[in-house]
Curated annotation (Swiss-Prot):
Chief site of localization: cytoplasm
Function according to Swiss-Prot or TrEMBL: Part of the phosphoribosylformylglycinamidine synthase complex involved in the purines biosynthetic pathway. Catalyzes the ATP-dependent conversion of formylglycinamide ribonucleotide (FGAR) and glutamine to yield formylglycinamidine ribonucleotide (FGAM) and glutamate. The FGAM synthase complex is composed of three subunits. PurQ produces an ammonia molecule by converting glutamine to glutamate. PurL transfers the ammonia molecule to FGAR to form FGAM in an ATP-dependent manner.
Keywords: ATP-binding, Cytoplasm, Ligase, Magnesium, Metal-binding, Nucleotide-binding, Purine biosynthesis
Binding-site list for Mg(2+) 1: 94, 554
Residue sites binding substrate per the record: 95-98, 117, 241, 313-315, 556
UniProt name for this protein: Phosphoribosylformylglycinamidine synthase subunit PurL
Gene: purL
Transmembrane segments: none
Source organism of the structure: Synechococcus elongatus (strain ATCC 33912 / PCC 7942 / FACHB-805)
Entry EC no(s): 6.3.5.3
Top EC class of this enzyme: ligase
Family: Belongs to the FGAMS family.
Classification via SUPFAM superfamilies: PurM C-terminal domain-like, PurM N-terminal domain-like
Binding site for Mg(2+) 2: 118, 269
Length: 777
């Protein structure tokens, strides 16, 4: 007989907490008894995928996590890297996918609030926010509603809390029609002498609850985020938290002030699983126990019971361990900032989380049973790739309509390029970032959309570093081509890391470290687990190749919705890579727009006449948008070529030879050239070489090849070409010249013109694509 057969709960009640029958048996074994309702809820949230990574932890263990600049790796609230000169950067990415599908404004807003708390809990002042967003078909009214809500939520919270939203990415694909992805990344500059850790210590030390009050909002949010979305869960608004950015601003200042007193032993924000997670993780990491009295917790609603206290995910709350005798000093700081602060418990030697309510024990669980000793599933990989992938890999370029110098099928190359520029994934995101205050704090060096990565000035406000003059900056980006990952997760994940490093290199930054957000479907299905495992393998390999260790991140699984026939439809596997890099000299930062008439254009990476699997139309934006086909093999990543191309690009920027740099990504080389022309309001005359042996669409729209488009001051051409010949002798090509805007964009293949468009045509198509679709409401 299993324990569940004699449980004081029905099978439906247990399943309602996200607990499987075999997991309930394990709970009884760990406790030596049946849990009560509050304890069942605590196990439900702490054993959810969102909190314990029970399906992904074995895969995450292969990631590289150590490096010369890594100060804090996985396991804390955020990673921390050493930037030199006493500057330390905290950074992390988190998801808020399910809440944003249900209530897009609050779901996205509280996602921003949560990631900011991860940063300042370490003792860092938040200096920048990025986001990686995925939505469905923008022609659909529901997608437009979600898009409006998510962007409004991000802008509301970030603008009000006073942290600039400086960059990120937005993509659209029908694969996300039912399940948008909202990943938020934040950066912070350390203000404290010591990094604040989460592990509790000091028997008898008081435990402080600080911040906002506790209510019933966000009940069971962690479990909600660890299950597929259904018609019922899409109406589950109580599982979505409600944030207050003005209160969070006060919390930032109060926490940083408190940390500087030296009276804080440990700190943990209350994010997923609220009080349950913060008490269990602090106790387990410190090898101690915690006693907490719920009657002392400040509340905003009456009649709450232990289950509700412990599972509430009310926002803007923190748990501190204070040095004994200094608790009042900390309480006074928080009261001065208009925040709640009470002693709600203490640290005990017995490694147990013990919860009191109305004078009795409401819950008593070994801390490690909630945090460390959780279920882990070692799932079996299929013997061969799934049928859908094998079938997609059979596609070849010969299956496309015939192409000539005029066009493909009945469409001209002009028309096809404009079609790609009109794709919301490629088009201008001005509608998005104009809603963000991207210059608050006055440290934003590059405006959103002007370069391949965000760049922020490092200007400490406190401590010895604030007295030094520094011209350093930090660059950050988020990247993933989910279509690649759907077709071939291993190569797609490698491509995400490579593109992130390439984007940083295009602004002159040295890639340093990675935070990842793994957005996938159900790992319990063979296809879902294969996608997850292959992507993790690719990420691990690529991070080692680029010497960019993983400092932490987030796993968001069960991103699936039921279609009209009741069949689950997973998203594309989307392993988002957040990467940070060091800009050694802010006077030498590069944008993507052409700068001066007469500048020479160079293609770094595989030249236009290359023909191997490092370039491909498989999985390309051209194939998906122009031919409504998702098939083929994405381009293979050549790590050695990537490293050499990126290094010479950074060198050219640091030397002042390169005036603009832009990587060739979605849409291929033609789109990259058009985007640089648009950004600089200048034209270009480009020749891609003879058509012999190549289709024109291969020359124009093939993706991959470690490619970067750069423009160079003519005065530096000789020294630049000498450096190229020394560093990447077979991987560069002079392809043209920057021209007056009136000359437009002219792309030829040998003597054969392919594209001739005015800069105004490019700007109008690219610049208004999203607004034209939103105007349909």
């Amino acid at each position: 007989m299993t324990a569940i057969s004699s449980a004081p709960f029905s099978a439906d009640e247990i399943a309602g907490e996200g607990i499987k029958p075999e997991e309930y048996d394990a709970i009884v074994e760990r406790l030596g008894r049946h849990p009560n309702k509050a304890e069942l809820g605590m196990f439900g949230v702490m054993w959810s995928e969102h909190c314990c990574y029970k399906n992904s932890r074995p895969l995450l263990s292969q990631f590289p996590t150590e490096g010369l600049r890594i100060l804090v790796g996985p396991g804390e609230n955020a990673g921390v890297v050493d930037l030199g000169d006493g500057l330390h950067l905290a950074f992390k990415v988190e998801s808020h996918n399910h809440p944003s599908a249900v209530e897009p404004f609050q779901g996205a807003a509280t996602g921003v609030g949560g990631i900011l708390r991860d940063i300042f809990t370490m003792g860092a002042r938040p200096i920048a926010i990025l986001n990686s967003l995925r939505f469905g078909d923008l022609e659909q009214p529901r997608t437009r509603r979600l898009f409006h809500g998510v962007v409004s939520g991000i802008s509301h919270y970030g603008n009000c809390v006073g942290v600039p939203t400086v960059g990120g990415e937005v993509a659209f694909d029908p694969a996300y029609n039912g399940n948008p992805l909202v990943n938020a990344m934040a950066l912070g500059l350390m203000e404290t002498d010591e990094i604040v850790k989460a592990g509790a210590s000091g028997i008898g030390n008081p435990v402080l609850y600080v911040g906002s009050t506790t209510g019933r909002d966000g009940m069971g949010g962690a479990s909600f985020a660890s299950a597929e979305l259904s018609d019922e869960s899409l109406d589950d608004r109580p599982a979505v938290q409600v944030g207050d950015p003005f209160l969070e601003k006060s919390l930032i200042e109060a926490c940083l002030e408190a940390f500087k007193t030296g009276a804080v032993v440990a700190a943990q924000d209350m994010g997923a699983a609220g009080l349950t997670c913060s008490t269990a993780e602090m106790a387990a990491k410190g090898g101690v126990g915690v006693e907490l009295d719920l009657d002392l917790i400040p509340v905003r609603e009456s009649g709450m019971v232990p289950y509700e206290y412990l599972l509430s995910e009310s926002q803007e709350r923190m748990l501190f361990v204070a040095a004994a005798g200094r608790e009042q000093e900390l309480i006074d700081i928080f009261h001065r900032w208009g925040l709640q602060a009470v002693v709600a418990g203490k640290i005990i030697a017995e490694p147990i989380v013990r919860i009191f309510w109305q004078g009795a024990i409401a819950a008593e669980i070994p801390a490690t049973a909630l945090s460390d000793n959780t279920p882990i599933y070692h799932r079996q990989l299929p013997d061969e790739p799934p049928a859908y992938a094998q079938q997609a890999w059979q596609w070849t370029i010969d299956q496309l309509p015939a192409a000539t110098e005029v066009g493909c099928g009945d469409r001209s190359w002009n028309d096809l390029l404009l079609t790609l520029l009109d794709s919301p994934t490629i088009a201008s995101k001005r509608w998005v970032y104009r809603q963000y205050d991207h210059q608050v704090q006055n440290n934003t060096v590059v405006l959103p959309g002007a370069a391949d990565a965000a760049v922020v000035r490092l200007r400490p406000q406190m401590g010895a570093a604030a007295l030094k003059t520094s011209n350093k900056g930090v660059a950050a980006t988020t990247d993933c081509n989910a279509r690649y990952c759907y077709l071939q997760p291993y190569e797609g994940a490698k491509a995400a890391v490579a593109e992130a490093a390439r984007n940083l290199s295009c602004v002159g930054a040295e890639p340093l470290a990675v935070t990842d957000n793994l957005n996938f479907g159900s790992p319990e299905k063979p296809i879902g687990y294969w996608q997850l495992a292959e992507a993790c393998r690719g990420l691990s390999e690529a991070c080692r190749e680029f010497s960019t260790p993983v400092t932490g991140g987030n796993v968001s699984l069960y991103n699936e919705t039921l279609d009209s026939d009741g069949k689950p439809q997973p998203i594309y596997p989307t392993p988002v890579v957040g990467m940070v890099g060091l800009v050694p000299n802010l006077d030498r930062v590069c944008g993507q727009g052409f700068q001066s008439v007469g500048d020479r254009l160079y293609l770094l990476g595989l030249p236009t006449q290359a023909a191997d699997d490092r370039l491909s139309l498989g999985g390309s934006e051209y194939l998906a948008i122009a031919h409504q086909t998702v098939a083929g093999l994405p381009p293979r990543i050549d790590f050695d070529l990537e490293r050499r191309v990126q290094a010479v690009c950074r060198l050219g920027i640091h030397q002042g030879w390169i005036r603009s740099a832009h990587d060739s990504a979605e849409g291929g080389l033609a789109v990259a050239i058009a985007e640089s022309a648009i950004a600089g309001s200048l034209g270009a005359r480009v020749n891609l070489g003879e058509l012999v042996g190549h289709r024109p669409d291969w020359l124009l729209f093939a993706e991959g090849g470690a490619r970067i488009l750069v423009s160079v001051d003519p005065a530096h051409v000789a020294v630049w070409e000498a450096e190229l010949q020394a560093q990447i002798p077979a991987a560069w090509q002079a392809i043209g010249t920057v021209t007056e805007a009136d000359a437009g964009l002219a792309i030829a293949a040998g003597n054969q013109p392919l594209v001739q468009l005015s800069v105004d045509q490019l700007q109008q198509t690219w610049g208004g694509a999203i607004e034209r679709r939103l105007a349909k409401d």
